[in-house]
């Protein structure tokens, strides 16, 4: 009986492994995701789905819309921080920045505008401001979803979608591993771009807000990362959430971390699923 079962299993066609990429949040440290994607592309490995939170959703949207690693690098190098900031008057608004500039930047540079039309399935994670529940956007305007996923409370104004208000996805899923599984991933490669809390400088209002956000998300992130099949954690110590000037260092850190993890990923991809 056992031999017959084994013979039947051997004859059963095996489907391709569905690799899911979960890109975590971390503001300016998100440039590290570009380095990770460079190494994957050089190795001939393409994820079958990508889910992003906050900064991870920015890179995820560009990548799934069809931009290759070289194009992502070029976009990263040319990105002007001032083009992403639209300051408001904090005392009379619900955030230091509106967030319109980020949405405009995404719209101008995305090859595909709708989430459901992306070349690779895309998921964008945000948080319902009033219920505290998570939302996985798999349809709709990509720029608006990314803006919502990146709306750090008190830094960016909440984003209205379908009559509800949404803020940063990092409140519920700093690294969206479970959402990659929800979308059907057999294997989840998680990229954690958080930095040791003690290594982050908090010497300005924006830095203090982002550091507070990092503290809130640490335990949740640690819990979720346990569900990943492989975690890539670039060495980003000393690179603050607002350190756009460190983009080259962040990209290189992503390359180094993914290169080290590549042999283990290749082993995981040799698994077979019925």
Where are these regions (language model features)?
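Patatin-like phospholipase
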Residues: 1-53, 61-274
């Amino acid at each position: 009986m056992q031999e017959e079962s084994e013979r039947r299993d051997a004859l059963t066609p095996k489907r391709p492994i569905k690799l899911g990429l979960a890109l975590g949040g971390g503001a300016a440290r998100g440039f590290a995701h570009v380095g990770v994607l460079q190494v994957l592309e050089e190795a001939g490995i393409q994820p079958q789905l990508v889910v992003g939170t906050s900064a991870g959703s920015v890179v995820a949207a560009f990548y799934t819309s069809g931009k290759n690693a070289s194009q992502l690098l070029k976009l990263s190098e040319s990105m002007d921080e001032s083009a992403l900031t639209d300051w408001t008057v904090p005392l009379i608004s619900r955030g230091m920045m509106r967030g319109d500039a980020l949405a405009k930047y995404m719209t101008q540079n995305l090859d595909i505008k709708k989430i459901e039309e992306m070349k690779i399935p895309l998921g964008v994670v945000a948080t319902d401001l009033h219920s505290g529940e998570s939302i996985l956007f798999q349809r709709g305007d990509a720029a608006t979803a990314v803006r919502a996923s990146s709306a750090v409370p008190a830094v960016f104004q909440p984003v209205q979608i379908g009559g509800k208000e949404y803020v940063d996805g990092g409140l519920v899923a700093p690294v969206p591993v479970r959402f990659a599984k929800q979308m059907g991933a057999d294997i989840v490669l998680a990229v954690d771009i958080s930095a040791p809390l003690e290594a982050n400088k908090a010497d300005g209002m924006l830095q203090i807000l982002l550091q507070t956000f990092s503290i809130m998300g640490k335990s949740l992130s640690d819990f979720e990362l346990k569900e990943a099949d492989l975690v890539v954690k670039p060495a980003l110590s000393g690179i603050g959430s607002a350190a756009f000037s460190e983009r080259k260092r962040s990209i290189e850190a992503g390359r180094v971390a993914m290169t080290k993890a590549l042999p283990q990923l290749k082993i995981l991809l040799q698994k077979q699923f019925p």
